[in-house]
Amino acid sequence: MNFGGVIENVVTREEFPLEKAREILKNETIAVLGYGVQGPGQSQNLRDNGFNVIVGQRPGKTYEKAVADGWVPGETLFSIEEAAKRGTIIMCLLSDAAVMAVWPTLKPYLTSGKTLYFSHGFAITWNDRTGCVPPTDIDVIMVAPKGSGTSLRTMFLEGRGLNSSYAIYQDASGKAYDKTIALGIGIGSGYLFETTFQREATSDLTGERGSLMGAIQGLLLAQYEVLRENGHTPSEAFNETVEELTQSLMPLFAAKGMDWMYANCSTTAQRGALDWMGPFHDAIKPVMQKLYASVKCGHEAQISIDSNSKPDYREKLEEELRQLRESEMWQTAVTVRKLRPENN
């Protein structure tokens, strides 16, 4: 398929229907390890689509959530070790830190002929740092939904689909491609586009630190601060920085592109946007280049490994998120959201 003049391999539901996916995986036991971020959405979608699915999860709140979602202890819900033992396809949907922690326990169950599935290329791409080196006699594949597990599940229930990338790291069986696409269709992907573990991992970490999360918070905060420093009220600064973007403009360029969004704004807005996008691009691109280099060399992966392995990681994370949540900009957001007509 043509993406901006570049031909890429894409698989759609039309050419690879659900019935074909079911036939390919009819004799497989799909063991979903981890019921945190991606686990609930992928496992429930597979179950609802008629596949043989079990879940592996350690006791705790997440285990209780799995029970609440209809997974039955001893029948479809097991320990991570027992699920890995029973599964012929092992879907490793644990966090990157958890994958590293359980790898010594998991590896004995990666016996010849099995398939190891990931939804992120982190553990394999930087396996010199993670220690996650799979046996050579198993298939190692990936389907990476381009969004959260919650979005994957919500869109599935709405009859829609979240796009996913796919990759094959090892094809010991000669059937890895069919299994990969079948699983991608089974979890509810809208369409699947080809990548590699390395490309997925580097683009994913770049996106999270860049325009999807890190950069957008930095950009929004900078504009909000400048407006506040120049006498604008919190509500005005927030509306002109965040609320108009998320509620009015993003739906426009999500639907038909940036040019269409520009075309549906005032001529004053159009002129200003066209004039200032260049200076912003020139200021931001060097930062993006620095970020990408830090990701590609493994530095960002090492930061994540070191940070997430500390015993007080969760406490420090909660403190950082608390500071973000209690900042003036995001406290203003709470009030603004309450004033939306649909919330009254």
Residue spans for each PLM region:
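Rossmann-like NAD(P)-binding element
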Residues: 58, 67-125, 133-148
